[in-house]
Amino acid sequence: MPKYNLINQKGDFLSQIDLDDEIFGISINKQVLYDVVNAQRASMRQGTHATKNRALVSGGGKKPWRQKGTGRARHGTIRSPLWRGGGVAFGPSPRDYSVKVNQKVRRLALKMALSWKINNKNLILIDNINLETHKTKEFQNILDQLNIQQKTLILTKDLNHNLCLSIRNLSKVLLETVSHVSVYQLLSYSTIILTKEAANYFEENLK
């Protein structure tokens, strides 16, 4: 089992704890990570794009002139894509972009992402985050004490009211619960702050 330093919110060393190899120490398969991230990003798309084709554009039910004898090109409707004000040919229509990924693969990718962060020393294991107020300054002091300046993802077991309010004005910080975090989020942020409770949740639920 890999040993990892547990610190408090001031950055002081508390102890070394054993992390489960099956969660935080597995080998990385980039193809699995790519497939899951690709699916998660695709599911973010609304897919509500739409244009009006010749059937949806208002009007055009009557033939503009008779078929023969006028010397003009033959037309059956003024809403043909060839006409000004006509429908769009082969335009986008609403669709569902979601891609099915098996639950086993999603869980595997989540474990790989955590292992990746552990291997690259981009994960900070903290005992707990306690804030007396909801002021941004108080949480910024914690980031300064931990010497964190890059994009940061905070993973907790449950949402904390003061913590939620204190990070709202920090553009580079995101708070997420372990039950809702995605592989895309784990890989998008440079630093992960993981509480001890959140780590225990992963070990209990990702096996």
UniProtKB/Swiss-Prot annotation:
Record GO biological process:
translation
What GO molecular function terms would the record report? rRNA binding; structural constituent of ribosome
In the UniProt record, does the keyword Ribonucleoprotein occur?
yes
Please verify whether the record's keywords include Membrane.
no
Identify the keywords attached in UniProt to this record, alphabetized: Ribonucleoprotein, Ribosomal protein, RNA-binding, rRNA-binding
| Start-end of Basic residues biased regions | 63-76
A GO cellular component annotated for this chain's UniProt record is: ribosome
Give the top-rank taxon of the lineage listed in the UniProt record for this protein: Bacteria
NCBIfam families for the chain: rplD_bact
Which family does the record assign? Belongs to the universal ribosomal protein uL4 family.
Protein name, entry field? Large ribosomal subunit protein uL4
Record organism: Phytoplasma mali (strain AT)
